[in-house]
């Protein structure tokens, strides 16, 4: 029993040590069972995925959260006051709501790809995450899933944004900006803007959950750690 608690404490220290910029108190990760450390980390990160997606993939998950709320594209934002004076304030509000609803609808579709990346995480990946920065796991997921997630989100978001008349106006304006070299072609639609902002919000929330786990791993996932290390003899 004492050995179980000792090994558990080593894992907790390893998970938290990144906040100190490296291995705390000279901890050698080789003192841990690689398989157990990796399994424990994956369980904690699986919980983080569920929490991040669960917070965003619901009504008002984006719209009522200032950290991730998708505001008007910069080109429209600059003209917002004038447009409201011209009587299109309702359309602007509808556009903001629609963009955020599109993001809320897309985020739940990320779970499959994120959990696929989690399954494919190697022991070396796990060690790098344990001793990395406070968002090392989030960066791993971002590198592994950003491109396929963007492809998955885009059509879901497009089905919502294409229903907004002001979105069509934005797209027309953006296309002109491309010809002038102001915008890149891939950024010239409302769909691409919202897709990028949705991904930004998702990874921001995942980083928050990761920091919470690193700060208080036992408080965040005590039952899973007991389960992982309870069988160690």
PLM feature spans:
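Bacterial N-terminal signal peptides that target proteins for export
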Residues: 1-10, 17
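C-terminal segment of classical bacterial N-terminal signal peptides
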Residues: 15-23
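N-terminal Sec/ER secretory leader and immediately downstream segment
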Residues: 25-98
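Residue-level signature of catalytic and energy-coupling elements of molecular machines
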Residues: 52, 122, 217
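Alpha-helical transmembrane segments and their juxtamembrane interface "caps"
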Residues: 56, 105, 109, 139, ...
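Mid-length scaffold segments of soluble, non-membrane domains
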Residues: 89-160
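An amphipathic alpha-helical core segment
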Residues: 156-197, 202
């Amino acid at each position: 029993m004492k050995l179980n608690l000792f090994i558990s404490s080593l894992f907790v220290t390893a998970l938290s040590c990144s906040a100190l910029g490296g291995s705390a108190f000279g901890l050698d990760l080789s003192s841990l069972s690689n398989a157990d450390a990796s399994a424990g980390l994956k369980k904690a990160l699986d919980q983080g995925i569920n929490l991040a997606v669960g917070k965003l993939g619901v009504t008002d998950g984006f719209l009522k959260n200032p950290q991730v709320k998708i505001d008007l594209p910069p080109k429209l934002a600059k003209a917002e006051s004038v447009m409201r004076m011209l009587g299109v304030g309702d359309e602007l509000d509808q556009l903001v709501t629609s963009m955020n609803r599109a993001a809320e609808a897309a985020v739940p579709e990320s779970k499959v790809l994120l959990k696929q990346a989690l399954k494919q995480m190697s022991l070396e990946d796990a060690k790098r995450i344990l001793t990395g920065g406070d968002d090392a796991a989030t960066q791993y997921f971002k590198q592994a899933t950003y491109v396929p997630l963007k492809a998955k989100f885009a059509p879901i978001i497009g089905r919502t944004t294409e229903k907004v008349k002001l979105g069509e106006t934005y797209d027309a304006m953006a296309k002109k900006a491309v010809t002038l070299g102001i915008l890149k072609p891939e950024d010239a639609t409302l769909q691409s803007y919202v897709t990028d902002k949705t991904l930004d919000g998702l990874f921001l929330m995942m980083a928050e959950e990761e920091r919470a786990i690193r700060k208080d791993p036992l408080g965040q996932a005590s039952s899973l750690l007991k389960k992982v290390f309870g069988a160690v003899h």
